[in-house]
Amino acid sequence: MPEYKAPLRDMRFLIDEVFDFHGRYQALGASDATPDMVAAILDEGSKFCEQVLAPLNRSGDEEGCHFDNGVVTTPKGFKEAYAQDVEGGWNGVASDPAYGGQGLPHSLGLLLSEMIGASNVSWGMYPGLTRGAMSAIHAHGSQAQKDLYLARMTAGTWTGTMCLTEPHCGTDLGIIKTRAVPNADGSHAISGTKIFISAGEHDLSENIVHLVLAKLPDAPAGTKGISLFIVPKFLPDAEGNVGARNAVSCGSIEHKMGIKASATCVMNFDGATGYLIGEPNKGLHCMFTMMNHARLGTGMQGLCLGETSYQGAVRYARERLQMRSLTGPKAPDKPADPIIVHPDVRRMLLTMKAFNEGNRALAYFTAQLLDTEHLSQDAAERERAADLLAFLTPICKAFMTETGQEVTNLGMQVYGGHGYIREWGMEQLVRDCRIAQIYEGTNGIQALDLLGRKVLGSQGKLLRGFTKLVHQLCQAQAEHPQLKGQVAQLAALNAQWGELTQQVGLAAMKNADEVGAASVDYLMFSGYVTLAYFWLRIALVAREKLDAGSGEAAFYEAKLATADFYFSRLLPRTAAHAAAIQAGAAGLMSLSAEQFSL
């Protein structure tokens, strides 16, 4: 299994030099988020991830979760690692101090989440889903619900889930069959079956708090009739003491391609006691608070697994001896040269490096927007941050997982035949990453959300909010002595972005299928241009540091070389996506269903 080491130098480069986290924390009044606090989270968090979680990654995949008559047991070592997580207070880093959290900015929580996901993504899903459930309760629950649930979930002694999918519906939640019948005491009896429920049952915590979508007896049809309920595994009393077992049980666990140490459960609700969150028939709105949290977390999985794969691939490429360099021996004292000297291996490694480091910048920028949305005292600034978040969330989820899958595949390819063998660990990263393109809304759905709802639905407002940032950067750096070529390339694509949007919008006025036909290519085009914006920002900082005579010349030179690779080798992929967007819907919709022959 590749040995994971947190990429602390690259993380600190973005935190301190590109995005100035400390300056932003001061502006937002986050006085506790000092440089020393950031350093402590990075240093202690990396030790926990490298020394405790990473060693459990392969064994967890090999063993998987065990199911026995409704009881789910996590792999060996998971429970002990979770106890250390609880003892360290890691689950509450960015949680509300009113409920026992440390109250630090969301961006600091993301740093920890990155290291957890890269060291053991399956383990990380248990506390990760809990934080998502907490966000929904915090935003929409009553004060009594917050008081009862949040402190225990913040501590980690209770965990959380979200229960949406049913056997007959995943994306189309408007046709769910789970029902909520009012009880005399104000609670509801929840009946139905949910599937694909991550962390639905396990042995890590004393209670599990399920957030369940269901319909009331008089609910309107479709998504306008969905309500959200808290359904605890054990019914707590008013003081939070765990009481009687609720009528919710795990019917089975799934046998999956990857993330095998994360329990994916079929959950049966047989008249279970549930408590309404928010208003009746407004459950989807409440759940999307959690879903947006989960989508950003899922995007991070692409980065996390890509980082671990890259680290393994680089080490292997430096050590594996095969053939001689085309330009002559580079290690004449050895029987062959290390494969890292070969151009195609370089292509793979640079692709991995460029996507990982670009995606990390995108993730950290997005995390800063979360900080602004939650902490800024300026209403207009909060609104701008919320708009940018709405626009970037589907890009983060879909583009980061699409490129993350490419990166893990390339990592396996660098190993050649050994990459296909389980004991090396590279194929596990491919398997674990694959689900990220599917759950929390498939990438096709993210593409529809981006183009249909976020861009066209806002009459272009959300797109303009981001392209304005790109335009301002390009305008300011148009005459940069070393980087003006990359600036011009980005400026041209930024303009084309608006033109493509207008073309699709006009075509969709005559045929709604034009949106669906263009959406995935539109999202990928958007992702490549978005990463180019961040790579330009990275390159500008690196160039400035080199010009100032930095003592870390090799680090900054590598940034410039990787930026050049991105602009010259990866960004041109936008041309293919633009051509596909302009091809329109006709080529996709001309065949009848019967003409898809078997």
Spell out what each predicted region is:
Residues 65, 78, 126-130, 141-183, ...:
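Internal maturation/activation junctions in enzymes
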Residues 131-133, 142-145, 442, 450-494:
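A structural-propensity feature for long, helix-poor, extended segments
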Residues 196, 235-251, 256, 263-294, ...:
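A glycine-rich, basic-preceded beta-loop-alpha segment at the flavin cofactor/substrate interface
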Residues 187, 191-245:
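A short core secondary-structure module
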Residues 25, 30-32, 62-74, 286-297, ...:
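Glycine-rich cofactor-pocket loops
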Residues 1-124, 148, 579, 583-598:
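Amphipathic, small/basic residue-rich leader segments at the start of a protein or domain
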Residues 2-5, 259, 365, 387-465, ...:
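Alpha-helix capping/hinge segments and adjacent helical runs
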Residues 111, 457, 473-598:
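C-terminal amphipathic alpha-helical interaction region
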